[in-house]
Amino acid sequence: MERPLWVRWLKVYAIGGAIIGSGFLLFKYTTPTDQQLISQLSPELRLQYEREKKLRQSEQQALMKIVKETSQSDDPIWKTGPLQSPWERNGDNVQSRDHFAKVRAEEVQKEELARIRNELSQLRSETEEKTKEIVQDKQVKSWWRFW
């Protein structure tokens, strides 16, 4: 004897719900959080991430400013205004990318220069101390003094 149609549909919905629910639970409990991902990065990549964090935030703020300006205008949605469409072949979009790349490169250069300056000042202070020690030793132990 065949089961009623509603029993078969109930079985389909129950199995489908179980598949979807188990997929959701697997996704929720197996995907790492942002902090876990950052903590697992190598120290160099973590440092680079922290350095470029402000740049990404400023880039996002600039994008949100453009989106707000575009949403307040009466122009149709396909007229993006200062925000260039990725399908257009203008060089304006490339210029904004270049601008952010230049800003990023300048920040990296400034940090590198600061690090080099710190190392240089440490070396100068160390050599200055050693030079003073050598001069004091020479004054105390002069080869031409007999007394």
From Swiss-Prot:
GO cellular component: mitochondrial inner membrane; mitochondrial membrane; mitochondrion
Record-linked Pfam families: CBP4
Entry keywords, A to Z: Chaperone, Membrane, Mitochondrion, Mitochondrion inner membrane, Transmembrane, Transmembrane helix
InterPro entries: Cbp4
Main location group: mitochondrion
Subcellular location: Mitochondrion inner membrane
Entry keyword Cell inner membrane: no
Transmembrane segments: 5-27
Chain residue ranges for the region called Disordered: 73-94
GO BP terms, alphabetized: mitochondrial respiratory chain complex III assembly
PANTHER family given in the database record: ASSEMBLY FACTOR CBP4
Similarity remark: Belongs to the CBP4 family.
Record function comment: Essential for the assembly of ubiquinol-cytochrome c reductase. It has a direct effect on the correct occurrence of the Rieske protein, core 4, core 5 and apocytochrome b.
Name used for this protein in its record: Assembly factor CBP4
Biological classification of the source: Eukaryota, Fungi, Dikarya, Ascomycota, Saccharomycotina
Name of encoding gene: CBP4
